[in-house]
Amino acid sequence: MSNDKQLKAVAFGEVLWDIFGNEKKIGGAPLNVVLRMKALGADTDMISCVGKDPDGDAIINEVEKLGLETNSILRSDDYPTGLVNVTLDERKSATYEILYPSAWDKIILNEETRELVVNADVLIYGSLVCRDEVSRNALYELLNTHTYKVFDVNLRKPHYDYDILKDLMQSANFIKFNDEELTEISEAFDSPYNTLEENMNFICSLTNATAICVTRGKDGALLLWDKHLYENNGYFVEVEDTVGAGDSFLGALVSCLLTGKEPQEALNFACATGALVAGSAGANPEISISQIQNLMHKR
Protein backbone atom coordinates (compact mmCIF):
# COMPACT_ATOMS: atom_id res chain seq x y z
CA MET A 1 0.00 0.00 0.00
CA SER A 2 1.42 3.39 -0.89
CA ASN A 3 0.05 6.35 1.02
CA ASP A 4 -1.06 9.29 -1.14
CA LYS A 5 -0.07 11.54 1.75
CA GLN A 6 1.68 10.83 5.02
CA LEU A 7 -0.78 10.61 7.87
CA LYS A 8 0.14 12.10 11.23
CA ALA A 9 -1.33 9.79 13.88
CA VAL A 10 -1.15 10.11 17.67
CA ALA A 11 -2.34 7.45 20.12
CA PHE A 12 -3.13 8.06 23.78
CA GLY A 13 -3.19 5.29 26.37
CA GLU A 14 -1.50 2.25 27.77
CA VAL A 15 2.01 1.04 26.97
CA LEU A 16 2.88 -2.07 28.94
CA TRP A 17 4.34 -5.55 29.04
CA ASP A 18 2.13 -8.50 28.12
CA ILE A 19 3.34 -11.45 30.23
CA PHE A 20 2.89 -14.90 28.66
CA GLY A 21 4.17 -17.31 31.32
CA ASN A 22 7.94 -16.79 31.29
CA GLU A 23 7.93 -14.54 28.24
CA LYS A 24 7.01 -10.87 27.93
CA LYS A 25 6.14 -8.84 24.86
CA ILE A 26 5.53 -5.12 24.54
CA GLY A 27 1.87 -4.25 24.17
CA GLY A 28 -1.04 -1.97 24.88
CA ALA A 29 -3.82 -1.56 22.32
CA PRO A 30 -3.12 2.09 21.32
CA LEU A 31 0.58 1.33 20.89
CA ASN A 32 -0.22 -1.70 18.75
CA VAL A 33 -2.46 0.44 16.52
CA VAL A 34 0.16 3.13 15.86
CA LEU A 35 2.94 0.58 15.36
CA ARG A 36 0.92 -0.96 12.54
CA MET A 37 0.17 2.50 11.14
CA LYS A 38 3.89 3.33 11.22
CA ALA A 39 4.67 0.10 9.38
CA LEU A 40 2.22 1.25 6.70
CA GLY A 41 3.87 4.64 6.29
CA ALA A 42 2.23 6.95 8.84
CA ASP A 43 4.11 9.45 11.01
CA THR A 44 3.18 8.32 14.52
CA ASP A 45 3.50 9.29 18.18
CA MET A 46 2.41 7.62 21.40
CA ILE A 47 1.33 9.54 24.51
CA SER A 48 1.70 7.34 27.59
CA CYS A 49 3.58 6.89 30.85
CA VAL A 50 5.91 4.18 32.18
CA GLY A 51 7.67 3.84 35.51
CA LYS A 52 11.22 4.87 36.32
CA ASP A 53 12.05 1.20 36.70
CA PRO A 54 13.80 -1.54 34.68
CA ASP A 55 10.53 -2.49 32.95
CA GLY A 56 10.09 1.15 31.92
CA ASP A 57 13.67 1.40 30.64
CA ALA A 58 13.07 -1.76 28.62
CA ILE A 59 9.86 -0.34 27.10
CA ILE A 60 11.60 2.88 26.07
CA ASN A 61 14.39 0.84 24.45
CA GLU A 62 11.91 -1.45 22.70
CA VAL A 63 9.75 1.41 21.39
CA GLU A 64 12.86 3.16 20.04
CA LYS A 65 13.92 -0.08 18.35
CA LEU A 66 10.48 -0.24 16.73
CA GLY A 67 11.12 3.21 15.28
CA LEU A 68 8.78 5.35 17.40
CA GLU A 69 9.75 8.57 19.14
CA THR A 70 9.62 8.22 22.93
CA ASN A 71 9.52 11.92 23.91
CA SER A 72 5.79 11.71 24.66
CA ILE A 73 6.11 8.55 26.77
CA LEU A 74 6.49 10.13 30.20
CA ARG A 75 8.23 8.58 33.24
CA SER A 76 6.65 8.22 36.68
CA ASP A 77 8.54 8.22 39.99
CA ASP A 78 5.49 6.99 41.87
CA TYR A 79 3.89 4.23 39.79
CA PRO A 80 5.31 1.09 38.15
CA THR A 81 5.37 0.26 34.47
CA GLY A 82 2.20 -1.53 33.39
CA LEU A 83 2.08 -5.32 33.37
CA VAL A 84 -0.65 -7.62 32.05
CA ASN A 85 -0.81 -11.35 32.70
CA VAL A 86 -2.14 -12.95 29.50
CA THR A 87 -3.76 -16.40 29.47
CA LEU A 88 -4.60 -18.19 26.20
CA ASP A 89 -7.47 -20.68 26.07
CA GLU A 90 -7.65 -23.76 23.84
CA ARG A 91 -8.88 -21.58 20.95
CA LYS A 92 -5.85 -19.30 21.45
CA SER A 93 -8.14 -16.46 22.58
CA ALA A 94 -6.63 -14.25 25.26
CA THR A 95 -7.87 -13.22 28.69
CA TYR A 96 -6.08 -10.50 30.64
CA GLU A 97 -5.22 -9.66 34.25
CA ILE A 98 -4.34 -5.96 34.10
CA LEU A 99 -2.37 -4.79 37.14
CA TYR A 100 -3.51 -1.58 38.88
CA PRO A 101 -2.33 1.05 39.51
CA SER A 102 0.22 1.42 36.72
CA ALA A 103 2.11 4.41 35.37
CA TRP A 104 -0.20 4.61 32.34
CA ASP A 105 -3.12 5.23 34.71
CA LYS A 106 -1.44 8.53 35.64
CA ILE A 107 -0.76 10.26 32.30
CA ILE A 108 -0.43 14.03 32.76
CA LEU A 109 -0.37 16.25 29.68
CA ASN A 110 2.26 18.88 28.95
CA GLU A 111 2.48 21.51 26.21
CA GLU A 112 4.32 19.14 23.87
CA THR A 113 1.74 16.37 24.14
CA ARG A 114 -1.15 18.80 23.68
CA GLU A 115 0.55 20.24 20.60
CA LEU A 116 1.07 16.77 19.12
CA VAL A 117 -2.67 16.12 19.14
CA VAL A 118 -3.65 19.57 17.85
CA ASN A 119 -1.32 19.07 14.86
CA ALA A 120 -2.26 15.44 14.15
CA ASP A 121 -4.59 14.14 11.45
CA VAL A 122 -5.99 11.51 13.80
CA LEU A 123 -6.10 10.73 17.54
CA ILE A 124 -6.58 7.08 18.53
CA TYR A 125 -7.78 6.27 22.04
CA GLY A 126 -9.38 3.41 23.94
CA SER A 127 -11.56 2.87 26.98
CA LEU A 128 -9.12 1.01 29.23
CA VAL A 129 -7.03 4.12 29.93
CA CYS A 130 -10.11 5.75 31.49
CA ARG A 131 -10.22 3.38 34.47
CA ASP A 132 -8.31 6.00 36.52
CA GLU A 133 -9.45 9.61 36.69
CA VAL A 134 -5.96 11.07 36.12
CA SER A 135 -5.53 9.58 32.65
CA ARG A 136 -9.26 9.96 31.99
CA ASN A 137 -9.11 13.71 32.64
CA ALA A 138 -6.08 14.03 30.36
CA LEU A 139 -7.91 12.21 27.58
CA TYR A 140 -11.07 14.29 28.03
CA GLU A 141 -8.97 17.42 27.52
CA LEU A 142 -7.58 16.02 24.25
CA LEU A 143 -11.06 15.09 23.07
CA ASN A 144 -11.89 18.81 22.97
CA THR A 145 -9.51 19.32 20.03
CA HIS A 146 -10.73 19.34 16.42
CA THR A 147 -8.52 16.40 15.40
CA TYR A 148 -10.30 13.41 13.79
CA LYS A 149 -10.91 10.91 16.60
CA VAL A 150 -10.90 7.12 16.50
CA PHE A 151 -12.28 5.31 19.55
CA ASP A 152 -11.11 1.72 19.90
CA VAL A 153 -13.57 0.17 22.37
CA ASN A 154 -11.70 -2.24 24.62
CA LEU A 155 -13.98 -3.75 27.26
CA ARG A 156 -11.90 -5.41 29.97
CA LYS A 157 -13.94 -6.23 33.07
CA PRO A 158 -14.05 -4.64 35.61
CA HIS A 159 -12.28 -1.63 34.07
CA TYR A 160 -15.16 0.29 32.48
CA ASP A 161 -18.55 1.87 33.06
CA TYR A 162 -21.26 2.84 30.60
CA ASP A 163 -21.39 6.56 31.42
CA ILE A 164 -17.72 6.95 30.53
CA LEU A 165 -18.16 4.78 27.43
CA LYS A 166 -20.96 7.06 26.30
CA ASP A 167 -18.70 10.12 26.69
CA LEU A 168 -15.97 8.40 24.69
CA MET A 169 -18.39 7.37 21.94
CA GLN A 170 -19.92 10.82 21.68
CA SER A 171 -16.47 12.38 21.20
CA ALA A 172 -15.52 10.03 18.35
CA ASN A 173 -15.77 10.37 14.59
CA PHE A 174 -15.02 6.65 14.14
CA ILE A 175 -15.75 3.82 16.60
CA LYS A 176 -14.38 0.28 16.43
CA PHE A 177 -16.01 -2.60 18.34
CA ASN A 178 -15.77 -6.35 18.26
CA ASP A 179 -19.12 -8.09 17.84
CA GLU A 180 -19.49 -8.93 21.55
CA GLU A 181 -18.70 -5.34 22.57
CA LEU A 182 -21.25 -3.91 20.14
CA THR A 183 -23.93 -6.27 21.44
CA GLU A 184 -23.16 -5.53 25.10
CA ILE A 185 -23.09 -1.75 24.66
CA SER A 186 -26.20 -1.68 22.47
CA GLU A 187 -28.11 -3.66 25.10
CA ALA A 188 -26.83 -1.35 27.84
CA PHE A 189 -28.27 1.62 25.95
CA ASP A 190 -31.62 -0.13 25.37
CA SER A 191 -31.28 -0.95 21.71
CA PRO A 192 -34.41 -2.67 20.36
CA TYR A 193 -32.32 -4.38 17.65
CA ASN A 194 -30.64 -7.78 17.33
CA THR A 195 -28.36 -7.68 14.29
CA LEU A 196 -24.89 -6.15 14.09
CA GLU A 197 -25.91 -3.92 11.18
CA GLU A 198 -28.96 -2.57 13.02
CA ASN A 199 -26.92 -1.91 16.15
CA MET A 200 -24.20 -0.13 14.16
CA ASN A 201 -26.86 2.28 12.92
CA PHE A 202 -28.27 2.50 16.45
CA ILE A 203 -24.87 3.58 17.85
CA CYS A 204 -24.55 6.15 15.04
CA SER A 205 -27.91 7.59 16.06
CA LEU A 206 -26.75 7.90 19.70
CA THR A 207 -23.43 9.55 18.92
CA ASN A 208 -21.67 11.90 16.53
CA ALA A 209 -19.80 9.04 14.84
CA THR A 210 -19.95 8.92 11.05
CA ALA A 211 -18.07 5.61 10.79
CA ILE A 212 -18.38 2.37 12.73
CA CYS A 213 -16.46 -0.84 12.33
CA VAL A 214 -17.22 -4.21 13.93
CA THR A 215 -14.78 -7.13 13.91
CA ARG A 216 -16.09 -10.70 13.96
CA GLY A 217 -12.97 -12.76 14.67
CA LYS A 218 -12.33 -15.33 11.94
CA ASP A 219 -15.49 -14.16 10.15
CA GLY A 220 -14.03 -10.81 9.13
CA ALA A 221 -15.61 -7.43 9.76
CA LEU A 222 -18.33 -4.92 8.90
CA LEU A 223 -17.70 -1.26 8.12
CA LEU A 224 -20.30 1.49 8.08
CA TRP A 225 -18.70 4.37 6.16
CA ASP A 226 -20.47 7.34 4.62
CA LYS A 227 -23.82 5.62 5.29
CA HIS A 228 -22.83 2.55 3.23
CA LEU A 229 -22.20 -0.91 4.71
CA TYR A 230 -19.15 -2.90 3.60
CA GLU A 231 -18.38 -6.49 4.57
CA ASN A 232 -15.44 -8.89 4.54
CA ASN A 233 -15.96 -12.53 5.55
CA GLY A 234 -12.41 -13.09 6.79
CA TYR A 235 -9.25 -14.85 5.63
CA PHE A 236 -8.23 -18.27 6.91
CA VAL A 237 -5.02 -18.60 8.94
CA GLU A 238 -3.83 -21.07 11.56
CA VAL A 239 -4.22 -19.00 14.72
CA GLU A 240 -1.12 -18.63 16.90
CA ASP A 241 -2.64 -16.09 19.30
CA THR A 242 -5.22 -13.33 18.94
CA VAL A 243 -3.30 -10.70 20.94
CA GLY A 244 -3.11 -7.46 18.96
CA ALA A 245 -4.95 -8.76 15.88
CA GLY A 246 -7.80 -6.28 16.28
CA ASP A 247 -5.33 -3.46 16.93
CA SER A 248 -3.40 -4.14 13.73
CA PHE A 249 -6.69 -4.47 11.86
CA LEU A 250 -7.70 -1.01 13.09
CA GLY A 251 -4.32 0.54 12.31
CA ALA A 252 -4.48 -0.80 8.76
CA LEU A 253 -8.10 0.26 8.27
CA VAL A 254 -7.60 3.83 9.51
CA SER A 255 -4.39 4.18 7.47
CA CYS A 256 -6.19 3.13 4.30
CA LEU A 257 -9.39 5.11 4.81
CA LEU A 258 -7.70 8.36 5.81
CA THR A 259 -5.35 8.24 2.82
CA GLY A 260 -8.25 7.93 0.39
CA LYS A 261 -8.51 4.20 -0.29
CA GLU A 262 -11.87 2.80 -1.34
CA PRO A 263 -13.74 1.49 1.75
CA GLN A 264 -14.04 -2.10 0.48
CA GLU A 265 -10.36 -2.22 -0.47
CA ALA A 266 -9.46 -0.74 2.92
CA LEU A 267 -11.60 -3.31 4.77
CA ASN A 268 -10.12 -6.23 2.82
CA PHE A 269 -6.58 -5.00 3.49
CA ALA A 270 -7.30 -4.55 7.20
CA CYS A 271 -8.90 -7.99 7.57
CA ALA A 272 -5.90 -9.64 5.92
CA THR A 273 -3.55 -7.69 8.20
CA GLY A 274 -5.45 -8.74 11.33
CA ALA A 275 -5.53 -12.36 10.20
CA LEU A 276 -1.76 -12.44 9.67
CA VAL A 277 -1.20 -11.00 13.15
CA ALA A 278 -3.48 -13.70 14.63
CA GLY A 279 -1.39 -16.26 12.76
CA SER A 280 1.81 -14.96 14.38
CA ALA A 281 3.06 -14.82 17.97
CA GLY A 282 2.63 -11.56 19.88
CA ALA A 283 0.87 -8.30 19.12
CA ASN A 284 3.37 -6.69 16.73
CA PRO A 285 4.86 -9.21 14.31
CA GLU A 286 6.61 -7.89 11.22
CA ILE A 287 4.29 -8.31 8.24
CA SER A 288 5.07 -7.24 4.69
CA ILE A 289 2.69 -5.63 2.23
CA SER A 290 3.26 -8.60 -0.10
CA GLN A 291 2.16 -11.06 2.63
CA ILE A 292 -1.02 -9.03 3.11
CA GLN A 293 -1.73 -8.87 -0.61
CA ASN A 294 -1.00 -12.58 -1.07
CA LEU A 295 -3.55 -13.47 1.61
CA MET A 296 -6.12 -11.09 0.09
CA HIS A 297 -5.84 -12.81 -3.29
CA LYS A 298 -5.57 -16.36 -1.95
CA ARG A 299 -9.21 -17.19 -1.31
What does each of the following model-derived ranges do?
Residues 5, 9, 18-84, 88-93, ...:
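Substrate-binding N-lobe of the ribokinase-like
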Residues 16-19, 156, 181-183, 237-238:
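A short, flexible beta-alpha/helix-coil linker loop
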Residues 1-8, 189, 193-299:
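Conserved phosphate-binding/catalytic region of the ribokinase-like
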Residues 19, 97, 184-185, 277, ...:
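Residues that scaffold the ATP/ADP-binding catalytic core of kinase and kinase-like folds
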Residues 32-35, 118, 170, 264, ...:
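A broad detector of short, well-ordered amphipathic alpha-helices
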Residues 13:
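Active-site beta-alpha turn of Rossmann-fold NAD(P)-dependent dehydrogenases/reductases
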Residues 1-10, 62-65, 70-74, 90-229:
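Ribokinase/PfkB-type carbohydrate-kinase core domain
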Residues 85, 96-99, 232-233, 253:
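Beta-strand scaffold of nucleotide-dependent catalytic cores
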